[in-house]
Amino acid sequence: MYSTSTVKTRQGVELFLHRWQAGKPLARIALLHGLAEHAQRYDAFAQRLNAAGIELIAVDLRGHGRSSGERVWIDRFDDYLLDADVLVEVAETSAPAGVPLFLMGHSMGGTIAALYVAERAAKRKLAGLILSSAALKPGRDVPRWQLALGKIIGAIRPRFPALTIDPALLSRASGVVEANRRDPLVHHDAIPARTGAQLLAGMTRIEAKRASIALPLFVFHGTADKLTEPDGSRDFEAATSSTDSTLLMLEGSFHETLNDLDRDRVIRALIDWTLVRANLQRSRM
């Protein structure tokens, strides 16, 4: 069953929540979407999870989808961590006790999720971290001077239109690309320089703190991703202190592996991984 609601952050930002409920959930996943998109795009994925007994709860980040806030704008990356905290708190309190909760992030949502686990998850009871095509490292082809210039522009001209996302790079499935282009809730205009600079700052913080992450970890990425760096996922998985980590690299897949030609493979792997860890956690309760 699908339902929506709203909740306000301590800053007064109204966030739009999506919940796909399973009848008797075996596990819950709290999802953080990527830059310039929104959580409703995960409906097909959520239905697959529900069929396996996994509940999905997701939030439109501030400035995205149906949430309030200036479009795709943040003053500091910690603003997104506040949104993540609201999502996790709602997920913890809105389902039956004893159902393990996993935090998942796609693309920039993966940056948020990883940093949240590294810096703030001690007060939460998370059963694992799932990262989909996470933005964890600048692209290998991006010159250092361009990164430095982006930070400067983000400071002195924060709303400068810095970059756009080409929908053709999301998936090899043409229907996915066209649906994205027609979606009025997707932000199709340029991303402000401040938002881009803060995303880079988030990556730097993760690199310094990733060794502290010890949760069970499932990381997957397409090798042909041109929007986020596949090596970022490889390096992150190798650098954490998790003793239960899985890395799945999908040969030839584009950025949205959940919507690409290999989606059945990755969704099945994600479901299997989640249910095994959920069963392990329940056995320890």
Regions found by a protein language model. Give the residues of each.
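N-terminal cap/lid segment of alpha/beta-hydrolase-fold proteins
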Residues: M1-A22
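Active-site glycine-rich loops that stabilize anionic/oxyanionic intermediates
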Residues: L26, G34-E37, M108
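Conserved alpha/beta-hydrolase
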Residues: A46-E70
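Alpha/beta-hydrolase active-site loop
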Residues: I74-T93
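Alpha/beta-hydrolase-fold enzymes
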Residues: H106-I191
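Short beta-strand/loop motif that positions the catalytic acidic residue
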Residues: I213, V219-H221, D225
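Conserved alpha/beta-hydrolase "acid-adjacent" motif
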Residues: K226-G232
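Catalytic active-site module of serine/aspartate enzymes centered on a nucleophile-bearing elbow/loop
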Residues: D244-M285
